[in-house]
Swiss-Prot record:
The protein, known as: ADP-ribose pyrophosphatase
Limits of the Nudix hydrolase domain: 55-193
This protein's UniProt keywords: Hydrolase, Magnesium, Manganese, Metal-binding
Cofactor annotation: Mg(2+)
A GO MF label: magnesium ion binding
NCBIfam families tied to this protein: nudix-type nucleoside diphosphatase, YffH/AdpP family, PRK10729.1
Family membership noted in the UniProt record: Belongs to the Nudix hydrolase family. NudF subfamily.
A GO cellular component annotation in the UniProt record: cytosol
Length: 209
């Protein structure tokens, strides 16, 4: 047993035995079957466990923030996965994109800001990263906040070859956070990013002054 340094958990990667990993489906996304054993809290090793894991890569998320005007830029687009559980499948979100091999989080954030919102990002600051739903997918999302001039944000954007149809919204920081509290913004990356901004906006303004 090798406990991870500085983490308040019991076990580490050395306490997992990967028996096999098989790709069941590969398309735009992939589905992998993991067969593994892991150490139990009683010190024994488990029986073989089988889990199907959705593999879609990792995402970069950008919170576009104008520290002078105290405004954020949100994008609106259809998300068909929200159809069954939300009042509408059109969601208000952060700028985001999948990280390709050789790209950094900042590379993707700056590229997607142009593609999805027509925004040029000035300074950036890492916020945090999180596992989207570790019970079923390996995806990790990394959030950055980016300094923008919100007066330049407007219009309809997106790549036609990716069937994107994206509308830009510029709202006050207070309004965006109110929508979080009211459940009108209910996707994880946007909720986390806007909650972080609500806690740190003054320090960020001082840093970027």
């Amino acid at each position: 047993m090798l406990k991870p340094d500085n983490l308040p958990v019991t076990f580490g990667k050395n306490d997992v035995e990967i028996i096999a990993r098989e790709t069941l489906y590969r398309g735009f996304f992939s589905l992998d079957l993991y067969r593994f054993r892991h150490r139990l809290f009683n010190g024994q090793m488990s029986h073989e466990v089988r889990r199907e894991i959705f593999e879609r890569g990792h995402a970069a998320v950008l919170l576009p923030f104008d520290p002078v005007r105290d405004e954020v830029v949100l994008i609106e687009q259809i998300r068909i996965a929200a159809y069954d559980t939300s009042e509408t499948p059109w969601l208000l979100e952060m700028v985001a994109g999948m990280i390709e091999e050789g790209e950094s989080v900042e590379d993707v954030a700056r590229r997607e800001a142009i593609e999805e919102a027509g925004l040029i990002v000035k300074r950036t600051k890492p916020v945090l990263s999180f596992l989207a739903s570790p019970g079923g997918t390996s995806e990790r999302s990394s959030i950055m906040v980016g300094e923008v001039d919100a007066t330049t944000a407007s219009g309809i954007h997106g790549l036609a070859d990716e069937n994107e149809d994206i509308r830009v919204h510029v709202v006050s920081r207070e309004q965006a956070y109110q929508w979080v509290e009211e459940g009108k913004i209910d996707n994880a990356a946007s909720v986390i990013a806007l909650q972080w901004l609500q806690l740190h906006h003054q320090a960020l303004k001082n840093e970027w002054a």
